[in-house]
């Protein structure tokens, strides 16, 4: 257990991972979703907390957008994505009257909901809780880190794309982690090359190696590259499990490798 005190609704959660990105559109929610699915295939019980309040996309990625959140004595009961109840999900997307409603809130109201999400969701026993955060470094990130600090999170996973502008934003994310005392468990480079669906050749549309070079210079682990893969996009659009439905996907081995490294890091703490 990572918690050092009675954690209330988080007392049964063994490892907490925050997924961060310096800018929007780098596939942070995609990586959060795929790692959660891969952890489930490794026999782990996983929760996903979607605190990207203005862009809650994970319910759709897991084909759970039509499900409802219920109340219990301990607070909110998360939505279970599968029949085995091995993946549970909480998102503001479940609390909106209409899926297309915009969240037009000022900072204090957002921060209050984040704190409520951290304290009032009845997760039960989980091996991993993955927290999908908004892009950038804002009030919401500070509120999330502060609310989780008593529970000693495993650390932050930083997602970037190969372009220099994205890598530069991740540098600021590294500074944020350092200032808030949040351990960085690794960097993932997403959209790293395009895999042709016909010949499976990988072409570097943007560039390559920016995330790995940043990890080397910063002294943090580089967990791997995930290519642009039409099958990965298809699985997310259809709300399907990539590893189950598309085992020949080019992204499959990359996601599997990243997940194995996370499991290896977590095992000494279990």
From Swiss-Prot:
Protein name, per record: Cytosolic Fe-S cluster assembly factor nubp2
Instruction: State what this protein does.
Output: Component of the cytosolic iron-sulfur (Fe/S) protein assembly (CIA) machinery. Required for maturation of extramitochondrial Fe-S proteins. The nubp1-nubp2 heterotetramer forms a Fe-S scaffold complex, mediating the de novo assembly of an Fe-S cluster and its transfer to target apoproteins.
Q: Which SUPFAM superfamilies match?
A: P-loop containing nucleoside triphosphate hydrolases
> What residues does ATP bind to?
22-29
List, in alphabetical order, the GO biological process terms annotated in this UniProt record: iron-sulfur cluster assembly
Single GO molecular function: ATP-dependent FeS chaperone activity
Annotated family: Belongs to the Mrp/NBP35 ATP-binding proteins family. NUBP2/CFD1 subfamily.
Q: Where in the cell is it found?
A: Cytoplasm
Q: Which organism is it from?
A: Xenopus laevis
Protein's gene = nubp2
- CDD domains in the record, alphabetically? Mrp_NBP35 (cd02037)
């Amino acid at each position: 257990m990572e918690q050092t005190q009675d954690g209330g609704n988080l007392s049964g959660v063994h490892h907490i991972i925050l997924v961060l990105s310096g800018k929007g559109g780098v596939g942070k929610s995609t990586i959060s979703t795929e790692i959660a699915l891969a952890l489930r295939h490794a026999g782990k019980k996983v929760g996903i907390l979607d605190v990207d309040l203005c862009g809650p996309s994970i319910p759709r990625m897991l084909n759970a957008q039509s499900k409802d959140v219920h109340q219990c004595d301990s607070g909110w009961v998360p939505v279970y994505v599968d029949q085995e109840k091995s993946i549970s999900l909480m998102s503001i997307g479940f609390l909106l009257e209409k899926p297309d409603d915009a969240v037009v809130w000022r900072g204090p109201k957002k921060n209050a909901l984040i704190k409520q999400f951290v304290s009032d969701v009845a997760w039960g026993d989980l091996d991993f809780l993955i927290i999908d955060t908004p892009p950038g470094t804002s009030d919401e990130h500070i509120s999330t880190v502060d609310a989780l600090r008593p529970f000693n999170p495993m650390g932050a996973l930083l997602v970037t794309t190969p372009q220099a502008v994205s890598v530069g934003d991740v540098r600021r994310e590294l500074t944020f982690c350092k200032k808030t005392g949040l351990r960085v468990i690794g960097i993932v480079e997403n959209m790293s090359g395009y895999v042709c669906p016909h010949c499976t050749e990988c072409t570097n549309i943007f560039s390559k190696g920016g995330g790995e070079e940043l990890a080397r210079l910063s002294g943090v682990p580089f967990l791997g590259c995930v290519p642009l893969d039409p099958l990965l996009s298809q699985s997310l659009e259809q709300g399907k499990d990539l590893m189950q439905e598309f085992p020949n996907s080019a992204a499959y081995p990359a996601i599997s490798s990243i997940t194995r490294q996370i499991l290896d890091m977590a095992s000494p703490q279990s």
